[in-house]
Amino acid sequence: MRKKIIFVCQDCLSRNYVMSWSKQVLNRLIINKYCKHCNQKTKHLDSF
């Protein structure tokens, strides 16, 4: 079964991206994505 993950910008804490991930993986994901609120590429953490 897959789980829905929402990514949160580390700088402004806005929730920008949504992804699905398997429940078997327990590692935290950190990705570099563009944040439209910060107007730059920032690190995004997953929020279960």
Swiss-Prot record:
Biological classification of the source: Bacteria, Bacillati, Mycoplasmatota, Mycoplasmoidales, Mycoplasmoidaceae
Family from the record: Belongs to the bacterial ribosomal protein bL33 family.
Protein name per UniProt: Large ribosomal subunit protein bL33B
Name of the gene: rpmG2
Superkingdom to which the source organism belongs: Bacteria
Molecular function GO labels: structural constituent of ribosome
Matches recorded under Gene3D superfamilies: Ribosomal protein L33 (2.20.28.120)
Record keyword Endoplasmic reticulum present: no
UniProt keyword Transmembrane helix, yes or no: no
Keywords: Ribonucleoprotein, Ribosomal protein
Cellular component aspect of the GO annotation: cytoplasm; ribonucleoprotein complex; ribosome
HAMAP family documented for this protein: Ribosomal_bL33 (MF_00294)
Taxonomic source organism: Mycoplasma pneumoniae (strain ATCC 29342 / M129 / Subtype 1) (Mycoplasmoides pneumoniae)
